[in-house]
Amino acid sequence: MENKQATLELGTKPVGKLLIQYALPAMIAMTAASLYNIVDRVFIGQGVGAMAISGLAITFPFMNLTAAFGAGVGVGASTAISVKLGQKDYATAQNILGNTISLNLIIGIGLSIICLLFLDPILRFFGASDQTLIYAHEYMVIILLGNVVSHMYFGMNALLRAASKPKQAMYATIFTVVMNVILDALFILVFKWGIQGAAIATILSQLMALMWQIKLFSNKNELLHFKKGIYKLKRKLVDNILAIGISPFLMNVCACIIVIFINNQLVRFGGDLSVGAYGIANGIAMVFVMFVFGVNQGMQPIAGYNYGAQKLDRLIRVLNLSIIAATAIMVTGWLIAMFLPYYCARLFTTDKQLIDLGIKAIRVVMFCFPVIGFQMVITNFFQCIGKVKISIFLSLSRQLLILLPLLAFLPMIWDIDGVWYSMPISDFAAAVIAGVVMMWYMNKLKRQHQEQLKVKS
């Protein structure tokens, strides 16, 4: 079976070729996903106005918070499936597939109902002012009505990668981006639906991709496919999915908490346009962050399979290659941020004040990018091999343990500059912590590897 053969290659094919095979489609897909938000911001900034960008920026932590639940399930399930495939436990992998579908349906519908009931208070808490609330409200109503579609779409893409179909996952993501661009232009520029048009374009493009994903998993000739009896939730499988997925879930939740706090501090010390500037900087930064997420997603099935198969030499090899790739990506982002910030900001708006604020925001937010790729890969590595506590600690160290106190303290000294400078300082400190933890664990891994070689000899 072709799909089964592709899965077995995770333990035999050269690691470098495997990483390119899995990471390149994921990088393209994740970068395309980051363009999703950029496209919305560009069309809204050019077609609606500067204040609409600030309103849209308020919604992103909200959207990420709801997506955190789907990401937790998706990453947890894909990692669990990869490990089970490495152990050749195909029946359990099949049941994990079905349980993932059920979990995403339940969570997607439940979150939509709760958030719609308390939408305006939530947006106020996230930093919306009287000027930006109307834009944020109009956008989020439509996004929440289609939330179950988003959960299913992102969850199915994670499952495609675990099922040794990284190219199909890439195609699905690229399709949604292309359709989003087309529909944004149609709904915003032609139909004049404003920020609501951007939200409708997002949900419709994801729905079309989801229909194709469902068709792929309906093929009974595939190793992993839909069939009767796999959708009933099983406590052991759900616990395993959630235990692995708790790290990315907490990472996303912490990121949302931080962005909420950043938005509120920016409004307090710099006004609504500062939130818009942060939205612009964050959009540019996320292009490169998503590249690294792509590397991480490419590493995940390789690391998970070889950890399950106890092939430690291949595990260490894929980790080292992933760190090199991530660092190269983030250095490229740093160079663009330092030398071409005007052109990045100008893409989103013609408002001179917002452009000036955006230039500063881009340079500060991306200042420590050369070390962030390393930190991201290390955190993901521990997640891939099931070391949940270490992964959670590294996730929390940057966001809650370092950045949050800095955001509270530094503005008292440097006003609005204190908000901006908190970000690169926490980035650098988190990278140092990740390096120390990794040195400790690598020594442990190398000892295990040497013992393994002695047993073989």
Predicted regions and their residues:
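Short alpha-helical transmembrane segments in multi-pass integral membrane proteins
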Residues: 1-23, 81-148, 190-245, 303-368, ...
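Hydrophobic/aromatic residues in alpha-helical transmembrane segments
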Residues: 24, 40, 77-78, 118-119, ...
